[in-house]
Amino acid sequence: MEGLEIEDEDVILLDEDDDSSSSSTVNNSSSNIKNNGNTNNNIGNDDSNKVTLMTSLREKGWGSGMLVDKEKNQYGTIKSYKDDKSSPWFEERQVIATLYKARVLLHEMIYTKMNQERLLSGNLCVGEIQSLLNTQKEDVETDWIAEIQELKRNMVAEIRRNHLLERDVNKLDKRIALLIKHRSNIKDLLLEQNKGKKDKKKKGDDKAEYITLDQKQLESYQNLFYLLQTEPHYLAKLVTLIQADQMEDFLDTVFLTLFGDDFSPREEFLILSLFRLAIGQEMSRIKSAGDLLAVESVVPKMIITYTRRKQGHEFLKQIIAPILENNVVNAPDLNLELNAVQVYQNMISEQEIQTGAKSTLNRGLAEDQIIQLKEVQSILEPRVEKCIQICERFFTGIIQSLNRLPYGIRWICKQIQSIAQKNFDSKPDEIAKVIGYFVYYRFINLAIVTPDAFEILDKELSITSRKNLVNIAKVLQNLFTLKTFQNQGSERWMQPLNKWILSKTSIVRQYLEDLIQVTDPSEYLRVDKYNELTLKLNPVVVISLGEISQTHRLLIANLAALKMKEKEDPLELILKALPAPLEVVDENDREIQLTLINRFKENIEKEISISASLLAETKELVISVLRSIPIQQKQQQQQHDDEKRDDLISILQNAIKHGKETNNPQLSSNAEKIINNLKKMEAEGSIQSENNQYEGFIKVIALEVINRQEIREQQRKERMRLTIALRDLRKHQSYLNDQIQHYTSYLKDVLLHYGPKDKKKSTKPMKISFKELTKKGVIVESDIPKLSHGSTSFYISSDAPGIFDIEARIGVASVGTLSLSLDDLLDKSSAGIPYLKLENIVLDVNMTLHLLNRHFLKNI
């Protein structure tokens, strides 16, 4: 093929169809950059290359027979040599055409790839940034941030209200049980509740009992809870030190109040940082990864509380609830009882109920004999098949929803896997069992066994449905922890399901392996600890005075173990600035909003290379200026010269001039302020300038603009999600109010059966001497002088149900009064607290209750 030489730079455009097919679909940002012509690559100059190619081909004698454009001949028909096999070198020409077409595509792909890489890295010039800004709508991002913050505050407030209602329901339930146990009158309980509400309202109006925080206290608590939120090592250590009876309330304070119930990148990053440290500490105290399953450790409790937040609840409601409802709850005749003995006993009972005669079946058969009976087998076999069928649906739903599993749960499992592999050199199956335990048993299983408690179903479950769910949960638990049922205890009846379990284990192993394939939180959430300095609004938490007091006391009690070795530990400094913890009781407990403030912000600023307080302001100003000035053009030859880059100061000076020329004083003012801010940041060492170029700063601006659309979309979704969350919370609040009404109705029904027979009978004050109370063990200690014991008497009366007024008299002179609450006594007795300390006297709780029961309660 003499005369045919293909130069390396030649590119061919075959015809109009080929041209359109070879054009790559570059993303919008890349297209905008290409159209502007401001790029550091010369790959995009395709038109000139194509002209060069056609000239080259004609010079080499390839003009004949290669008509690129179609044209009509003298007869009006379209003539093209493209498909004319009789033309010279037809096959060779087709090969060459294909090669050149491939080269066009390759060049376009390289061009797109390089521009995408430049976009991801933010390596754009000012003109390209302006081109991107022109494609974006100018909006006020801050307004959305403020709205989202307000929605979050409202949501947290609603969550707190719901929790208070739930506590009221639980307290009411407990009081009913205790009062019935002590033969209390239900009518008095209702009267006491009404009086308690009035008393509480009255006490709330009493300024002497209203707890207020002075400005210094408020600021210290703002600093304290910011420190706890952003420095996770304190809480990670504290959760291992507190008592078991304090754990649940404290974890609620941490996960619900301090980090919020809903998902947001900042709070999620912080809470996962807490998990990172807590998991590391927990696993440093055990000998193998499997010990996490065998011991009642802190991390499983943390995970349970964490998974009950909004994101975990939504997953369970969307994935698990439909399977539950369709296959178990709405199947009233479904019975998955696989215990052969129980099945046999049910057979006998049903036979006797149907016939009205005692069954002839032998009630004394051994288990091995029962399981061999054909009648029993005929019942068990279809139940096993049905159980497998339902388990298969749950299994499929769980496996196929991996990508919808909350990121935080997956990352926590990844941490466990990583530390287990590093610390213990654990085998893959051992780690898989641990991951399966946390994902299934500590998350999904709880919702399957008690869906009503997790609020993923509104229907009440029958006893049979609950038993069915327990059996289903057992099968899935063994499957996800890679175990089979053994021939012992209650497990022997589940052994027929082992074959199905074994058939799925390879899929489970792959699922658990895929589950931990997630990126680090800083990459996934696009958050790191330095983002704190760029927050446009300070974080806000809604917290009760009781929670503040509890946390304060726990920190003081464990400060020695919590503080760092440095002389000036931040936590210790804040605690020293605070007075003693608040004395909070139910009557004066209330919620406040804490705007969290970083007292030690300057310490973080020293660690980073950008002064974020000026950075956030300056970025917004630069974007505003770039929108208002003409697009900055670059000479083509400058794009290849690394020494010649954008002179940001010159651009800003031109902006000042442009503002004056166009009568836009705001533009000039903004540009001047940017120049001043740049000089300040440079003086602080936050940014560097080479010949007024500020290349690093321009890159920061580019990344801000490139990601702005995505950020806005995330905010839009978050706003919508928070609105829906608020609606659901208010629905649940309505449900709780209905539940309280149900309790009230129940109390009224009980009243019909347990009301006093003699409504006119009244309780007169009871007189009892000091010596008699001491003899009966009611009085344990007293500050009353011994000489006065003989002449001291107590008069006990009850004008209000559950409230006992005690007046002390020496002779006929009254020397003081006090009140005893039946609720307080019953609570202390239930909690095992032996003594009640009052002013000048200490009472034995149980002996006091006995006295009141004997002389008052039976007559109420």
UniProtKB/Swiss-Prot annotation:
Pfam families: RasGAP (PF00616), RasGAP_C (PF03836). Residues 1-20 have a biased composition (Acidic residues). PROSITE patterns: RAS_GTPASE_ACTIV_2. Changing residue 442 to E: Unable to complement a gapA null mutant. Residues 1-48 are annotated as: Disordered. The keyword Cell cycle applies. Residues 21-46 have a biased composition (Low complexity). Residues 269-515 form the Ras-GAP domain. One of its GO terms (biological process) is hyperosmotic response. Induction: Rapidly up-regulated by hyperosmotic stress, which is dependent on dstC. Strongly inducible by 8-bromo-cGMP and to a lesser extent by 8-bromo-cAMP. Not induced by DIF (differentiation-inducing factor- a chlorinated hexaphenone). Keywords: Cell cycle, Cell division, Coiled coil. One of its GO terms (cellular component) is cytosol. InterPro entries: RasGAP_C, RasGAP_dom, Rho_GTPase_activation_prot. Residues 146-185, 663-732 form a coiled coil. Changing residue 474 to R: Able to complement a gapA null mutant. Part of signaling pathway that is required for completion of cytokinesis. gapA and rgaA control cortexillin localization to the cleavage furrow and hence may be involved in cleavage of the midbody in the final stage of cytokinesis by regulating the actin cytoskeleton. Forms a complex by linking activated rac1A to ctxA in the absence of rgaA. Assembly of this complex is necessary for the recruitment of cortexillin to the midzone of the dividing cell. Heterotetramer. Quaternary complex with activated rac1A, ctxA and ctxB in the absence of rgaA. This is Ras GTPase-activating-like protein gapA. It comes from Dictyostelium discoideum (Social amoeba). The lineage of its organism: Eukaryota, Amoebozoa, Evosea, Eumycetozoa, Dictyostelia.
